[in-house]
Amino acid sequence: MRLNLSSQIVLNKVPVEFYKPKTTVEYSEISRMEKIHTDIFASMAEGASHVADKIEAGIKAAQQEGKFYVMALGAGSSLYSVYDELVRRYNEKTLSFRNVVVFNAYEYYPLQKDSSLRTINQLKERFLDHVDVAEQNIFTLDGFVAQDAVQDSCRLYEQRIKTFGGLDVALIGIGRSGNIAANEPGSGIQSMTRIILIGNTSREEMENSEQTKETIPPCSLTMGIATLLSAKSIYLTAWGEEKAEIMQKVVENSITDTLPASFLQTHPNVHVVIDLGAAHHLTRIEHPWLVTSCQWSDKLVRSALVWLCQKLGKPILKLTNKDYNENGLSELLALYGSAYNANIKIFNDLQHTITGWPGGKPNADDTYRPERATPFPKKVIVFSPHPDDDVISMGGTIRRLVQQNHDVHVAYETSGNIAVGDEEVTRFMHFINGFNQLFADSKDCIISNKYKEIKTFFAKKKESDFDTRDILTIKGLIRRGEARTACTYNEIPLDHVHFLDLPFYESGKIEKLPMTEKDVEIVRALLQKVQPHQIYVAGDLADPHGTHKKCTDAVLAAIDEEKKAGAEWLKDCRIWMYRGAWAEWEIENIEMCVPLSPEELRAKRNSILKHQSQMESAPFLGNDERLFWQRAEDRNRATASLYDQLGLACYEAMEAFVEYKPL
């Protein structure tokens, strides 16, 4: 069973020569916008293996010379794949770490006794406890030191590094604000190991990624920029689309102290190692026509023309031969003969993505429509990772499908219980206890006792405590109620609302369990029961908690199993991927766009507002300060505005989709 099919989704196939040039000359040409040596790999696994190769070579070279190999190690998640690869090599007895000295790059401060937040513990759990680094060769900053001794402790750390001859390598990740180790924006290039206040962006990122509910301390003790730059070599890793924007700034923009990682441009032996997702906004990947000749696919042509329109502030049909020639797109003139021909081609392509009939228009020519006319009506399943992703991402389309008489089912894949605040449980428990008092004279002892039990638990609950199973069940029940209310508002029958409660989610923690065949079989059973003509599935694979990806993998694996079994229903089924909760589709990838009127957008907002537990007090709103309904409206309006700017019809908002073809 293939459980990771989402990782094989390639919307824009990047030619290998763009990220893996064959010669130094080719690399120099295609990377001329880049100020740091950057190695791009097709996947995280390939990139991690490359870094591990370099680390292994350094360790073995030092062993042959009878020297220590001194490493500064970060504890960020982008390094986990590298650590896993190094551990694998140790287990296969091809690599020993007996001569390695480790210095932890940063530590939280101040730490409470028995704190689960210690970054050195994370390093040990992920890497050091699984290899043969001598305990006496592992050094970390002291998160427990008294405040008046912090500076002395930091100076001592610098001295210890020097006693081993300095750092041979620094292996680090990068934060959303461009921070390396814990060096926040504003850090100077001369900064040494010191105490530093954790910035708001870094704090949000930590709170979303740390597998604990313990409060993040206000400060960090960190190696300074100068300390990191003193290393003989530096490897910075980043994976996934969520790191694409910051990596473009670090690699291609000028040095600035507002972007600490940009100081790496001054180092003679620094290597940025990223995958295609993190490289997405680099010029050679996103706008390759500016640095090299291109193989012009339809998507790349569309991307280039949209870029040109935005740069010049013109609609597509007003672009001229001069515009093409002056902006690096003369190849398109040779390919199409004139700007007019290219303009018409892309204008029509975009026009054909727009449809007010997401389920297909009956008795109509569907030659240029994104969805086929028959069968009509269609059986539809909308898979929603959490109990509100359906309305956030495609609430307008769902209402349109229902109004056009399609048989719409909604499948909520997870309970979403950990995303409900304690005050919501308290409010509902007050209600049910009051109900018991009013209508049962408090005679229902189960309700009375459970009310007291939960009230006592919340009164004594610490931030590091996890909820009991009963409380998680109640939180899941709250979200079920909200989902049913939203479906009723959208006129979806309650017997068409399915709560799958996939087991991988039920860890009670931010970190979920692995997605397994058990999850897939639950999804597959629903597919076999409904046998849909249309499936809508989350394509928001960059969500910060990873739930969307696992949910999508479960659906794609179930479809894959049905395909292997020769299921007849799948032969007449189309699968559409939506976004909206965390990002929007790039216009070159959009294959169906459903316009919304002002009234329809308001109805979509009302659907989202039915999920009251996910408003201001929701625990996991992510790094975006806007509420989910605001994000959804802004993204939908932005899509409509872009179509308008390109010279197409002007709508209030639009929901975009990309078709998935089973691999």
What is each PLM-predicted segment?
Residues 73-78, 172-176, 239:
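Glycine-rich beta-strand-to-loop/alpha-helix junction loops that act as flexible
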Residues 64-92:
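Glycine-rich N-terminal segment of FAD-binding domains in flavoprotein oxidoreductases
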Residues 2-12, 25, 30, 226, ...:
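ATP/nucleoside-binding phosphotransfer catalytic cores, i.e., glycine-rich phosphate-binding loops
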Residues 21-35, 95-169:
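Ligand-binding beta-strand-loop-alpha-helix segment within the catalytic cores
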